[in-house]
Amino acid sequence: MSECCQHDHSHEREELPRTRHAGPVRLTFKVQGLDCAEEVSTLRRAVGPLVGGEDKLAFDVLNGRMMVLDGAANAGVEPIREAVARTGMSAVEWRPGTDGSGETERRRRLQAWFTAVSGALVLAGVAIHVWLAGSLSEAWRLFAGHGSAGMPWPELAAYALATAVGLRFVLPRAWSAAKRMQPDMHLLMTVAVFGAIGIDEWFEAATVAFLFALSLALENWSVARARRAISGLLNLAPTNARIKATDGTEREVPASEVPVGAHFIVRPGERLPLDGRVLAGASSVNQAPITGESIPVTKQPGSEVFAGTINGDGALEVESTKAAEDTTLARVIKMVEQAHAKRAPSEQWVEKFARIYTPAAIALALLIFVVPPLVFGAAWSDWFYRALVLLVIACPCALVISTPVSIVSALAAAARSGVLIKGGLFVELPARLKAIALDKTGTLSRGEPVVQRVLPLNRHTEEELLERAAALEARSTHPLARAVANAAATRGISAHSAAEVEIQQGKGVTGVFRGERFWLGSHRYLEERGQETPEVHERAEAFEREGQTVVAIGNDRHVCGLLTIADTVRPEARSAVKALRDAGIAHVVMLTGDNRTTAETIATQAGITEVKSELLPEDKVVAVGKLVERYGSVAMVGDGVNDAPAMARATLGIAMGAAGSDAAIETADIALMTDDLLKLPWLVHHSRRTLAVIRQNITFALSVKAAFVVLTFAGVATLWGAIAADVGASLLVVTNALRLLSPAWGSELSEDASVKN
């Protein structure tokens, strides 16, 4: 059988290298103060020379981690920590199992407290001003900007304290940036604050210090919010398991201590603590936390179950098949956490833009300060103030925070829906797809073919045909071989494996059974053997026109008979293909090792017009390569194991039904945890929604900056107004990014994010 044999032996071929993924990690550091892309850029410049280049570093802003990749120069832990310390941040070596979240949370709470105190002192200063002036209308003079003076000492003291408290976490970083001669937003804000103090604008200095501290607190909150969306997955699995001892007694132990092979009990309504196989009992299990399926799945003895899923109304006895740290849920969480280290193109663009934008804004501020007074004789104080406003505008807070939060939110939302995306790059790729190649068996079809007809010839019986076929296929694990074995078992036929079995790669199999040599193979193999009669040819053609796979069985004298085997198309296949086309992906191609007639029948049922059939494993790689050359951005959808070489050749590799399959999760760029083909158009729309949010945020943040540059030249903008606008922009872009976490918004398959291919 062409397809049978090709799948049986594809694992013997060497997989193509997957260069899109980050390399293995040598060292990981927990970095205090790593919150956004600007810190990433700072750390790359500081640590990159020690490890052999900036490309030897990867960053996980979500968890505040810096990774040194394999292949990096051996700099040692202490030199790296010292380099990080020179940036004003701190680093400690991190290992799996350690938890640095306590220190991070303590720092976040302390920073929030200082911010609140700074804000309270600013309000106190305003209250003192109003009280001493005796009129609320006098408060407006504070907000009028440059020109206010004559401040009484209690009010000045309140603003001075507000400034000092607001700069508590800013000054150390600003001093480090100044020493390195690499200005960052902390240095810009510090210069702006002290510049305002220099011209006796204490209210503006205090307001800028407070609002910048507020923007940093907002940044921490948004990252923590996205982090909680990921860590919430971890809480799905119970910490304890109810173990059943050999004497029948039950006791609770930590799930992390349960060995593989142990038996545990799951009562109705409880979550499963570990992956396993059902030994006794029957129940319906809600697998939505893993696969995103909304309908519970029936489980009975022999069924596979996953940690974090919810048991229905029946008790189950389960044998543990994986340790707690190796469950499907644990692997999903680990993959999602690591995914953010693989930066999306938009994240890389923002980081590069910030490197150019901030120095350019500083240069413009210097020109504004110097040129008008020198060339046109303008007042130095007025243009110095405007230069300070430009320094505030140069802070890229809203710009650098928006994209990472959007990417992390998209990763978390996808994981909740049963779609494991393994990097920011792969969040954006589905939006740009021009073509999708789908494997037939197990992807478009259920992958569980059954024997439809048994046609004996030349005086052989149906039982003899099934017995010989089962003997020849006894050692094969291919779905067609299982269909033969199931058909034989259904009729009560048991057969020992044939002797001297020889695989005819891509064609069939031969072997000796009951002292006689038999062969089994595809219609093409039958033709090559030269044993096909007109009658056999006519019948085989008729079966193939019905979309069935023909398997011939014979000996050295004649054809003993034919078996027809058919797979069934998934019920949602046609609607999924239509949804992909409606999304603008016009080229949907089916790849299969089946004969052309059978392949076209299946394709017609699925609504696919372009078919490539009778492909050997290496042919699929070539076919995908041609699609990439023709269309550019191409996804290959398969099982993640047999199709791994073809998936590696595609722009994007997507594995179907990856729940419980370690190989599929490892090899694919994106793993669909269930077999629902409708997840494909959902993925495309989700990617487009994410890109739309990122573009909206970048456009809005830059528009606010541009507007304030114009207002500054016009002499209308104030320091407090510029920083307030930046904080407001940060709040809006973060809120917009966090919309991606909304289940209601993310579930609207038909929503178009207006990002076209």
Pin down the residues of each PLM region.
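Membrane-embedded alpha-helical bundles of multi-pass transporters
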Residues: 135-151, 173-174, 179, 191-199, ...
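Conserved catalytic phosphorylation-site environment of P-type ATPases
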Residues: 186-190, 226-227, 239-240, 290, ...
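Cytosolic catalytic headpiece
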Residues: 1, 48, 247, 424-642, ...
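Bilayer-spanning, highly hydrophobic alpha-helical transmembrane segments
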Residues: 112-123, 348-377, 386, 390-396, ...
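Flexible metal-binding regulatory segments at protein termini and peripheral loops
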Residues: 1-151, 232, 247-252, 330, ...
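Actuator/coupling domain of P-type ATPases
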Residues: 79-102, 159-244, 259-264, 271, ...
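Conserved cytosolic catalytic loops of P-type ATPases
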Residues: 54-60, 65-69, 78, 232-326, ...
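Juxtamembrane helix-loop transition segments at the membrane interface in multi-pass membrane proteins
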Residues: 175-183, 218-231, 405-424, 738-753
